[in-house]
Amino acid sequence: MSSSRVLLTGANGFVGSHILSQLLNANFSVRAVVRSQSKANTVRGDFPSPSLDFAIVPDITAPGAFDEALKSHPPFDAVIHTASPFLYRAVSNNHEFLDPAIKGTTEILQGIQRVAASSVKRVVITSSFAAIGAFGQYDDANKVYTSADWTPTTLDDALTTTDLGIAYRASKKFAEKAAWDFVATEKPAFDLVVLNPPMVYGPLRHTVSQIGELNESNARIYNLFVAPANTPETPMPPNGVHLYVDVRDLAHAHLRALQVPEAGNTRFLLTAGQVSSQQIADIVRAEVPELESRTPKGTPGAKGLPETAFTADVSPAQKVLGITFTPMRETFSELARQLTEIEKAQGQ
């Protein structure tokens, strides 16, 4: 499949900006969907490309939210939908997690059917490992997750829990389920590719002028391994989700999902493998000497994970999409250096 005109949602985000960069570098024409003109202006500053235009969609859950954005001459060949919340912060109601993910996904698929059914041949959706399996737990001893797995989290769990992790897992699971159900029921002319990454780390491609503007995963790295409040004696933080992927590899998977005909109607797990807090700390301390005095030391060289910690099978992504993964040392050393630069720029 060779696509030339692409609609990309969430283009101003951590993952979306890398996808946008790789699409433009591959000579795609892209319409970026963002929530406000100010966000469009920021993205334009980062990507002054004549192959980029914008659509403003303030509320991706509103009926017909994407209809105007999907009108294009030349028409769109493909759509990449990345817009969804990843905010582990207090919300007044768990619908704040669920609605943008589920309704945003169904709205864009329905919009394609209404407005661009004759031209769109492929839709790529960014889901999450959260829709597949455990989230920072080791209770699935020796489990090797595959794209056939689904998290057991129910909708009732999500609406009644006080655990934001459960609400987030549900938002990803039911948004993705809605997409597959739509394809099965409506039988559209387009096919569907879903990408399921775990924790996403790596250098930023979009403008971030303050530490407080970091996405959640990179903010975690800053707070636990880079922030000046830490010392070598600071206790090594819990591992959290121990599967990860470099943001650039995830973005490349989105690009390949457009380019490879055989990827259609497939779900791809994407992870470079396991990583522990100890391994991240070891890399930061070794590769960024100026941070040695403020990165927890722990037990250098230790794996920092149980031998039975779960893993995932990424062979389909490697075979079908041709994905190779960035070395762990490169991912975390480049990120740590960039975080120190942001910190210095804001005078912290």
Can you say where each PLM-predicted feature lies in the sequence?
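Glycine/proline-rich active-site loop of Rossmann-fold NAD(P)-dependent oxidoreductases
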Residues: P188-A189, P203-I221, R256-R267
